[in-house]
Amino acid sequence: MVHNFIEFETERLKLRRFKDEDLEYFYQYRANPKVAKYQGWQDYSYEQAISFIEKQKIAIANIPDTWVQVAIELKDHGRLIGDFGIHTLELPLNSIEIGFTLDPQFQKQGYATEALNGLVNHAFNVLYKEKIQAIAVEQNDSSIKLLKRIGFRQVKKIENSPFKGQIVNEFVFELTKVDWVG
């Protein structure tokens, strides 16, 4: 079965396609310098947020070498609290790379762990992926701890990588379906 988008629910969260109502919350956390610190953007504009949401409302998942973003909604309030980036890799086959962003006011409440567990389960058991990868800047302790808590293993260190005008080290993490189901 081909899945053209990634939608599922966890106990407290709904992961779904972006919609117009997400714009204000999305812009609010994306424009926050604390959020952007370890992300690929900085000085995020309102116009960028509008364009991004318009593109993501019609994005199609599972196309090799493309990224889609999945909105993370708090079910009780219908409010956007973050998003996942999901990159369908060309090689290795049946693999994805992920990235994640969570609004700071919803951090340290278990939402990132719940959302990532849900995404991993969905990727392996619904989308039939075999491997999930993530890359984190060495200083991004929160993301590294989250990945390890879920079961990701560090498989590589990329030294002297350019990032936002600096030279940093990055860690590549992987989780395979075999390791996930144990």
Where are these regions (language model features)?
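Acyl-donor (CoA/ACP) binding surface of acyl/acetyltransferases
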Residues: 1-36, 72-182
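Hydrophobic residues in alpha-helical segments
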Residues: 30, 39, 60-62
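Conserved GNAT-fold acetyl-CoA-binding loop/helix
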Residues: 34-57
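Secondary-structure boundary/capping residues
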Residues: 44, 62-65, 132
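A short helix-loop-beta-strand connector motif used in the catalytic cores of GNAT acetyltransferases and
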Residues: 57-71
